[in-house]
């Protein structure tokens, strides 16, 4: 965890409790205590990195030798118990479990499954899948100050999302946002999101590559976003119009 990087992403570290849990058991112990304290949000990053009990000697924290930890389904078994306990203990907390996808062996076709077993999915209210391409063609590039020169570098990438499973509303809703990891803008591009949503709702007109924003015209999405970043009062007006149509 980097407090400096978190701050750039908009995290208020003064209101954050950080616990470096390394095992599924540690995660459950800490999460239950936080739930009992009625903490609003808990984020586990990630359940894929947590070790199951099979990695440790009985009644101790000493790691076993690698050859003694090869038990199929050990992580899924422990995560099944974990989500049951967390579900029972939870009264008002939003619990976000971040996972990673793995290749599924033995399948006729290429397929990916999240770690932690099926219980994680079925105990969840909503499952959102995120993915992004590292291809050069999909990278977001911009000029970055390096010494006394401006050099074009990769500064971000588009991220796709889809609601894969949902107990609270319709599934299969999808979308995309831009994430910046370098340059003057760090994190999710909320300005670009306002532009795209306003266009979809007809608040902003677009013809070909031209955008019309409050009677001002711009060629290209990048120019339109640049204008909005320099005119936050226009962003505020667009947000009010968007909320008025929801």
What residues fall within each predicted segment?
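Conserved inter-motif catalytic segment of the P-loop NTP-binding fold
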Residues: 1-81
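Short Asp/Glu-rich motifs
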Residues: 4-5, 107-108, 217
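Residue-level signature of catalytic and energy-coupling elements of molecular machines
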Residues: 6, 45, 99, 124, ...
């Amino acid at each position: 965890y980097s407090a400096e990087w978190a701050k750039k992403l908009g995290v208020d570290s003064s209101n954050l409790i950080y616990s470096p849990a390394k095992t599924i058991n540690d995660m459950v112990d800490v999460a239950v205590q936080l739930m009992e304290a009625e903490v609003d949000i808990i984020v586990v990053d990630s359940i894929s990195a947590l070790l199951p009990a099979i990695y440790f000697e009985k009644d101790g924290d000493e790691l076993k030798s690698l050859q003694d930890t090869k038990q199929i389904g050990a992580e899924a078994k422990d995560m099944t118990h974990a989500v049951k306990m967390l579900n029972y203990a939870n009264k008002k907390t939003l619990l976000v479990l971040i996972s990673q996808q793995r290749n599924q062996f033995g399948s006729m076709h290429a397929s990916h499954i999240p770690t932690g077993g099926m219980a994680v999915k079925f105990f969840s209210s909503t499952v959102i899948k995120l993915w992004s391409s590292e291809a050069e063609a999909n990278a977001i590039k911009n000029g970055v100050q390096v010494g006394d020169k401006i050099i074009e570098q990769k500064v971000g990438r588009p991220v796709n999302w889809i609601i894969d499973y949902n107990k609270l509303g319709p599934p299969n809703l999808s979308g995309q946002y831009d994430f910046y990891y370098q340059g003057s803008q760090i994190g999710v591009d909320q300005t670009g999101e306002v532009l795209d949503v306003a266009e979809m709702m007809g608040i902003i007109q677009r013809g070909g590559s031209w955008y019309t924003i409050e009677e001002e015209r711009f060629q290209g999405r990048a120019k339109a976003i640049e204008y909005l970043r320099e005119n936050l009062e226009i962003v505020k007006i667009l947000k009010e119009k968007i909320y008025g149509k929801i």
